[in-house]
Amino acid sequence: FVYWIKTGKVARLSQLENSPSRVSWSPDGKWLAFSMKVPSKELSLVSPPKKPKGANWADPPKITTRFKHESDGSGYISPGFNHLFVIPAEGGTPRQITKGDLNHRGTPQWSSDGGHLLISSNLKKDWEYDFRNTEIYKISVESGEVKTLTNRNGPDRDFAISPDGQQIAYVGFDDKMQTYQVSRLYVMDIDGSNKKEV
């Protein structure tokens, strides 16, 4: 939904199958980017027999190969992955930008030209077991092509794009597997080059 201040009206932009989160306006105000979970199929080892009329059966067993399949407070996590979408600010059909069995988490930020979305996430193959590590990624809105801007053992996060769209400030550290580690402030060019600690 969007609340238009001038008219005081609320407009429904789309009807989505899951809840969108981390909504971000494009620089020209014509598009919204957001993250949303895309369900994947439950694993099944056998097909149960047909339920007899009047039978009161227990729920079928849940089978998972996921490292993190439960969460405190919400219990079992249904299978699926978070992906990025864009939708016209006036409403319409959302278009999925990212794909695959990876979670494209983090609040998307638009590049100054509106051609890319930047996120802080972990898109590596072993992401489930490397939960302390995140990188900053630049994703083409047109093609979904992903470019990794940072690449080290440790989190790179909480980034901000400069007003001229040419640099990115972010915090992070080289993970030394200690219980407490000090985050540092860095800057780099929008293409991931010229990284330096401030």
Q: Which stretches of residues belong to each language-model region?
A:
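Short loop/turn segments that connect beta-strands within beta-propeller blades
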Residues: 4-8, 88-92, 140-144, 189-193
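A flexible loop/linker signature enriched in serine peptidases of the S9 family
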Residues: 1, 15-21, 35-83, 98-105, ...
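Acidic, proline/glycine-rich low-complexity intrinsically disordered segments
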Residues: 6, 108-111, 115
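Residue-level detection of beta-strand scaffold positions
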Residues: 110-112, 142, 154, 185
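Short coil/turn segments that connect the beta-strands within blades of beta-propeller domains
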Residues: 28-30, 113-115, 164-166
